[in-house]
Amino acid sequence: MQHAFHSDIDALYDNPDLDDLLPDLKGRRRLNLIRQDLADLGVAGLVEHVEPVFTKDAALDLPTALGWLYVAEGSNLGAAFLLKEAVKLGFSETSGARHLAGAPEGRGLHWRTFMAALDTVALSHADEGRVVAGAEAAFRRTKTLVDTIFGEAVPA
């Protein structure tokens, strides 16, 4: 699920317009960490390729992309709880659970830095609505991935 979601948004981390707006955008990318984790688990070859939501060559609606990145960044806060459970299974921030690791400066500061930058982006009322719609689309995508991968409906 994480691989599919982060594949969906990976192209955003190379977008120069987003890079101008958000601090350390490339450093916030987690897809390669997920790939390393899958290799640690011996399941890298089992991952199916799915066409990502965002591609490098497609036109980008900046507010929509900001909504998707908001969800990705927010998920890193919850990853602290998942990391604790992963450690109980024998994984760590250096093997099997890299993508769950917090930022060197700490999860809270990492999130606040992102949010401070997001709050400074000049957006019209309509743009703000597209940010929210982008975040909602990212949450729906995550739920669809969970339902598909785990084969059962998860309450919304």
PLM features: residue spans?
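Metal- and O2-centered redox machinery and metal/ROS homeostasis
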Residues: 1-156
